[in-house]
Amino acid sequence: MVKEVVDSTTMKRVFTRITYEIIEQNKGISDLVFVGIKTRGVFIAERIAKRLEQLEGVTVPVGTLDITLYRDDQHDLNSHNEPQLNGNDIPVDITDKHVILIDDVLYTGRTIRAALDALMDLGRPKKISLAVLVDRGHRELPIRPDFVGKNIPTALNEQIKVAMQEIDEHDGITIEKLN
């Protein structure tokens, strides 16, 4: 059973709310860098950056982080049974910058732990904050987001799916019951 919990109109409001929270909690945004975790985190980062530019007239660099080699629970393997790497693309040096790490759903915290390891291999940021579109709870690691679009409590036998226009041809968030 699939249940829509956020439609496209509400999703736009969520992006605006996260953007305002980022503006309010940062004295200046000149040292900000948004880093999206592949795949949907990148699209979310780009949308927040676009909204920030509309509201404040400031362009924030947006980077892409591939955490494949840093995961402790899974790897995408290619035909040679090796991890499938897609590469990082961060347009600026993150050293001494305030990096806002962005992902779609925060669940156990393992993805974020892997992303923190990957980021630290790329430089030494002044500060790292975490923004997520959805916090569904059930943490296994002591990780807490700084910016949350929606808190959507779930059961362990449920899954949150985020649809993004860029790859899914529509926006929305659904909860699906697993078998």
Swiss-Prot record:
<dbReference type="GO" id="GO:0006353">
    <property type="term" value="P:DNA-templated transcription termination"/>
</dbReference>
<dbReference type="GO" id="GO:0003723">
    <property type="term" value="F:RNA binding"/>
</dbReference>
<dbReference type="InterPro" id="IPR029057">
    <property type="entry name" value="PRTase-like"/>
</dbReference>
<keyword id="KW-0808">Transferase</keyword>
<comment type="function">
    <text>Also displays a weak uracil phosphoribosyltransferase activity which is not physiologically significant.</text>
</comment>
<feature type="short sequence motif" description="PRPP-binding">
    <location>
        <begin position="99"/>
        <end position="111"/>
    </location>
</feature>
<dbReference type="InterPro" id="IPR000836">
    <property type="entry name" value="PRibTrfase_dom"/>
</dbReference>
<comment type="similarity">
    <text>Belongs to the purine/pyrimidine phosphoribosyltransferase family. PyrR subfamily.</text>
</comment>
<protein>
    <recommendedName>
        <fullName>Bifunctional protein PyrR</fullName>
        <ecNumber>2.4.2.9</ecNumber>
    </recommendedName>
</protein>
<dbReference type="InterPro" id="IPR023050">
    <property type="entry name" value="PyrR"/>
</dbReference>
<dbReference type="InterPro" id="IPR050137">
    <property type="entry name" value="PyrR_bifunctional"/>
</dbReference>
<dbReference type="Pfam" id="PF00156">
    <property type="entry name" value="Pribosyltran"/>
</dbReference>
<keyword id="KW-0328">Glycosyltransferase</keyword>
<dbReference type="GO" id="GO:0004845">
    <property type="term" value="F:uracil phosphoribosyltransferase activity"/>
</dbReference>
<keyword id="KW-0694">RNA-binding</keyword>
<keyword id="KW-0804">Transcription</keyword>
<keyword id="KW-0805">Transcription regulation</keyword>
<comment type="function">
    <text>Regulates transcriptional attenuation of the pyrimidine nucleotide (pyr) operon by binding in a uridine-dependent manner to specific sites on pyr mRNA. This disrupts an antiterminator hairpin in the RNA and favors formation of a downstream transcription terminator, leading to a reduced expression of downstream genes.</text>
</comment>
<keyword id="KW-0806">Transcription termination</keyword>
<comment type="subunit">
    <text>Homodimer and homohexamer; in equilibrium.</text>
</comment>
